[in-house]
């Protein structure tokens, strides 16, 4: 018998359809939960894509809620991060049913998903992140529930969209250029969504502890951009746990491997440290 049960539930109802989350529920829960956000250059993949890491975290006792969300080219910034905030609110509202502590919820995401979890965590209750109605949101207490999280795990995050856009142009990555254009309506919108800009302009209302992971052979996320993210976070006195992983490519953890197993252990250790610090 599997140690993890998987079920899909609707977490939000929008004008364009329902949004699903896949729940990875451990048979032996440790009472804590995390919301997972997939990558895909803001234009591809779904809640099933990061199943390897979802199963690893759930096997260790965590409830994992892996989200579908609206993305490009049919939807533009900030739709995705608004949906992610709704996903956090849903888990918080249903914490008793899901058997998780609402005060220890975290966010984890990779690549563009790493960008989106940072964006959501820094501005959880901004007006633009209150626009996706969660299921049962007719109740005022539900609709006003906070999307704040206790910590963030950002795996190879595209933290500064305009910087990565120029990098993609300079390196001839036309598919990445097209993906940026598909989700962001302009360079101004990319700049608006820059995590570094938000940190340095004091727009961030919440700066939770963060684990940032940079693979050494990442051809999609330049290391200089990630180091600038670390610096910007530290400038706000944010707690940063930075991991550089030599020899590994972008998005390696979407596939089972020893490196993925090691990363899962490191992620769990970081999460446990944040929960223990309460």
Q: Residue ranges of each PLM-predicted region?
A:
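Alpha/beta-hydrolase superfamily serine-hydrolase fold, recognizing
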Residues: 1-278
């Amino acid at each position: 018998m599997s140690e993890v049960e998987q079920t899909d539930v609707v977490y939000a109802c929008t004008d364009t359809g329902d949004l699903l989350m896949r729940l990875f529920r451990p048979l032996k829960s440790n009472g804590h939960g995390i919301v997972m956000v997939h990558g895909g250059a803001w234009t591809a993949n779904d809640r099933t894509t990061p199943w390897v890491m979802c199963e690893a975290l759930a096997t260790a006792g965590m409830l994992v809620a892996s989200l579908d969300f609206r993305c490009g080219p049919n939807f533009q910034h900030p739709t995705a991060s608004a949906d992610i905030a709704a996903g956090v609110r849903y888990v918080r509202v249903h914490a008793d049913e899901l058997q998780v502590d609402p005060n220890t919820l975290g966010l984890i995401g990779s690549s563009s998903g790493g960008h989106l979890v940072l964006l959501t965590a820094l501005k959880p209750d901004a007006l633009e992140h209150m626009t996706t109605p969660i299921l049962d949101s007719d109740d005022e207490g539900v609709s006003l529930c906070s999307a704040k999280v206790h910590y963030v795990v950002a795996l190879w995050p595209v933290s500064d969209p305009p910087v990565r856009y120029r990098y993609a142009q300079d390196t001839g990555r036309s598919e990445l250029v097209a993906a940026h254009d598909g989700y962001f309506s302009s360079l101004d919108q990319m700049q608006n969504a820059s995590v570094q800009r938000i940190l340095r302009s004091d727009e961030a209302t919440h700066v939770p502890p963060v684990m940032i992971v940079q693979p050494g052979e990442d051809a999609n996320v330049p290391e200089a951009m990630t180091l600038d993210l670390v610096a910007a976070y530290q400038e706000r006195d944010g707690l940063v746990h930075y991991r550089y992983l030599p020899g590994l490519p972008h998005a390696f953890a979407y596939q089972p491997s020893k490196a993925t197993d090691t990363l899962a252990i490191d992620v769990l250790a970081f999460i446990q440290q944040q929960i223990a610090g309460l």
